[in-house]
Amino acid sequence: MNNSADPTGQNNPANTTNPTDATLSTGGERPVLRFERVLAKPPEAVWRAITDREELRAWFPCEVIADAWEPGARISFPFPGTDMTLTGVVLEAEAPRVLAYTWGEETLRFHLTPEPGGRTRLVFTDETPPDIAARNAAGWQICLGHLAGESIATDAWKGHFDRYTAAFEPALGPQQGPPAGS
């Protein structure tokens, strides 16, 4: 059975106000968050933004230190100002189309498709533990907004988290808030 939670009704054809919200699929082993955005850059530029250490600093929630962007390569993700470091492994890398890697307990996937006008359709998924799905959806919404060059209010995370919590708890149970020390 595949259940999906849609916190804004974006799958309702009448709602076109915010196509950047996450959808949640619960039909597999783990919940999967899915975001889809059209970015105003060609795939090669988006690929650099998701693989270049300096460009990642502009939008990713922590440092990203990769041995290489090829299957099997190791990645570390130190969080500035904390003693927390996640580790990961590159699962798939086909420049400039697909990048997938583990991020701690999660699997992140970026799928890039060229769009007319030199733009790129990004489909981002996060295979996440169920109890942090709302937290992750709120965080990725902000991070992907930064990747798209959007101006994000400093207090936006809380509103996103509250909305996703209300949408996801019926399917996934209680949701954890921000990590300790955040």
For the regions a protein language model found, what residue spans apply to each?
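Short, surface-exposed helix/turn micro-motifs that flank interaction/cofactor sites
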Residues: 47-48, 91, 141
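Glutamate identity and glutamate-enriched acidic tracts
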Residues: 10, 29, 36, 44, ...
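Terminal "cap-and-tail" regions of soluble proteins that handle hydrophobic small molecules
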Residues: 2-26, 118-121, 126-182
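Hydrophobic-ligand binding "helix-grip"
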Residues: 65-71, 76-131
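Short beta-edge strand/loop motif at the mouth of beta-sheet-based domains
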Residues: 34-35, 41, 45, 51-87, ...
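Hydrophobic ligand-binding cavity/cleft-lining segments
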Residues: 1-63, 182
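Short acidic, gly/pro-rich beta-turn/loop elements at beta-sheet edges
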Residues: 45-47, 111, 132-134
